[in-house]
Amino acid sequence: MVMSKISFVIPCYRSARTIEGVVAEIQDTMASIPEYAYDMFLVNDCSPDDTFEVIRTLCAKYDNITGISLARNFGQHAALMAGLRRSDGDIVVCLDDDGQTPANEVGKLLAGIENGSDVVYASYESKHHSAFRNFGTWMNDIMTRMMLGKPRELHLTSYFAARRFVVDSMLRYENCYPYIIGLVLRATRNISNVPVTHRSRMVGTSGYTMKKLLGLWFNGFTAFSILPLRITTVTGITFAAAGFIYGIYTVVKKFVNPHVPLGFSALMAAVVFIGGMLMIMLGLIGEYIGRIYISINNSPQYVVKEEVGNNGKECGNGSVVNEGKKG
């Protein structure tokens, strides 16, 4: 029997005090599942603390860990893509660097894969996030249902396992706006959930700010669906029809009673409202056009500054590589 290989991909940001514990838990857990070989890919998303120095130490200590450092902060999803592109496991497991996603329950995700699912997401009965982060998750869930057709009963989190063919399909996306959930849903709908316990954060606070969450929502809103453009078209047709009908009504009313005032205030309110709607629609269309331009302009999905592995050997120290586009 050929031993399956598991690749763990962990995006790291401000995790100098937590990543060692996560790695140790993975090692302890995998020691109890001897039927799998495994390796780890730790991606430093240009963290301002000593995260990459800790990763470098771990790479020197263990020969199945590879450390990747990005040239600037590209975001969690781009960091995941960097790790996925380096991984070569039959099954890839993605999890967080803060210890909130329980590595000791990875067996549940692997069992789901072995039972036939292409992707298995961890689901939490209760989350130990701030109210702000939980609101962001709720909004993201609504958006993925509307834009990407996600089933209502499916829970999507940052802790999941995927088969190799799903990862390979995700990696065919080379533009600079990666959205992991959209890439997964585009590859397969054979997705299941397994219940796991969501832990409290070991130290620190979430790296997601309002700006980052808004960017993530807008990315998912526009990257994998033209539904917003269709909504814009329907809205425009609706307002045009309403304006035409109101115009006929005004003319008829004037003929019936010539002394009725036309209503300057109502007219201005309608003009301002419709003008605002037009600006929103133009902005949305402009966002799509801007993304097309940036993608054509070969903006990188991420840039690798340094990579360490193979028991501490440096593989690309100081190199700047555009991994998002390959000629």
Model-derived features with residue positions:
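Hydrophobic helical membrane-anchoring modules
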Residues: 2-3, 179-327
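Acceptor/aglycone-binding surface of glycosyltransferases and processive sugar-polymer synthases
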Residues: 68-72, 76-86, 100-178, 199-218
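Short conserved micro-motifs on helix faces and helix-strand junctions that flank
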Residues: 11, 70-72, 160, 233, ...
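Histidine kinase transmitter module recognition
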Residues: 11, 29-32, 43, 98, ...
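Residue-level recognition of specific faces of alpha-helices
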Residues: 39, 54, 64-67, 76, ...
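Structured catalytic core of nucleotide-sugar glycosyltransferases
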Residues: 1-130, 143
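Solvent-exposed polar/charged
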Residues: 60, 85, 111, 115, ...
